[in-house]
């Protein structure tokens, strides 16, 4: 028996962006926010004009990494450190992977439907903002 899960919609992506913005605005941290669909395609993006320029790239790479590994980037960062089981993974693939906290997968009914990434704050801040945004779905 096959069940169909509603994919991540533009409305969902806008909800995630708005929730992340509320969290970052309350903390006074300017960030970039990326939402990807299950295929890794950009669904929504928002960069605070005060955020560091590279945050747009880091938020997208964090979201992509969380999507590909179906895990928060905060949980996999230690795996690629020297001596970790996947130490060579970031350089062994031609993919925009970034093993820094701030990327989280998005699930619906237990199925992976996309990912959210934040960049611009400290890694633990970005992770907290992403987790807070997920609560809005």
Region annotations inferred by a language model:
Residues 1-137:
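Flexible, solvent-exposed loop/hinge segments and secondary-structure transition points
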């Amino acid at each position: 028996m096959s069940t169909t899960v509603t994919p991540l919609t533009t409305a969902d992506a806008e909800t995630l962006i708005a929730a992340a913005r509320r969290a970052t605005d309350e903390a006074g941290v300017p960030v970039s926010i990326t939402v990807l669909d299950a295929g890794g395609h950009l669904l929504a993006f928002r960069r605070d004009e005060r955020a560091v320029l590279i945050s747009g790239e880091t938020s997208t790479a964090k979201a992509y990494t969380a999507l590909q590994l179906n895990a928060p980037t905060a949980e996999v960062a230690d795996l690629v450190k020297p001596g970790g089981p996947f130490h060579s993974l970031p350089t062994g693939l031609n993919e925009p992977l970034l093993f820094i906290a701030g990327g989280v997968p998005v699930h619906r009914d237990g199925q992976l439907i996309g990912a959210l990434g934040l960049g611009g704050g400290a890694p633990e801040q970005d992770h907290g903002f992403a987790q807070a945004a997920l609560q809005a779905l």
